[in-house]
């Protein structure tokens, strides 16, 4: 018989959607271990698996790639996956105030932030986060609205197939 005890949880949600709050609320109130996994940069699981399998050691991986590896090494039936989506107006206002992983050239003015090609970078080195591309085409998002639409679509249509 297969052990289906929930031992870990993970969260999928765009930046500024409440993932941090949800993580801490669960950890504070339940005896369960958190695995960051794909968290904000989700949908391109195969990209992360390819990078992980090509690495000779965990030292060659970014922190985020190591977090993904930790999640992938768990059996899905032992991981409770949460998905969180915030009201679109509140979300974009919050994201514009705190532009996590947004390239400097796309941060100002607001018109540029909402209308330019959207992609994510590692804040410490300005290198693009390839795992945060359009999960269907592997291209950058046309704009922040396409990012939101496709990530919501992934949460609704693809995530339930995995957990």
Where are the regions that the model predicts?
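PAPS-dependent sulfotransferase catalytic domain
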Residues: 1-112, 140-160
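A solvent-exposed, charged loop/short amphipathic helix patch at secondary-structure junctions
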Residues: 102-137
């Amino acid at each position: 018989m297969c052990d289906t005890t929930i031992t870990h949880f993970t969260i999928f949600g765009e930046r500024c959607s409440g993932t941090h709050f949800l993580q801490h609320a669960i950890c504070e109130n339940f005896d369960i271990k958190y695995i960051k996994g794909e968290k904000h940069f989700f949908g391109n699981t195969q990209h992360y698996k390819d990078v992980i399998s090509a690495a000779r050691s965990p030292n060659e991986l970014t922190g985020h790639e190591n977090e993904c590896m930790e999640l992938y090494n768990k059996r899905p039936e032992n991981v409770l996956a949460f998905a969180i989506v915030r009201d679109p107006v509140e979300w974009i206002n919050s994201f514009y105030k705190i532009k996590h992983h947004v390239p400097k050239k796309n941060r100002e003015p607001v018109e540029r932030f909402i209308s330019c090609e959207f992609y994510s970078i590692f804040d410490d080195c300005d290198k693009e986060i390839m795992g945060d591309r359009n999960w269907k085409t592997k291209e950058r998002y046309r704009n922040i609205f396409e990012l939101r639409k496709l990530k919501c679509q992934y949460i609704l249509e693809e995530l339930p197939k995995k957990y």
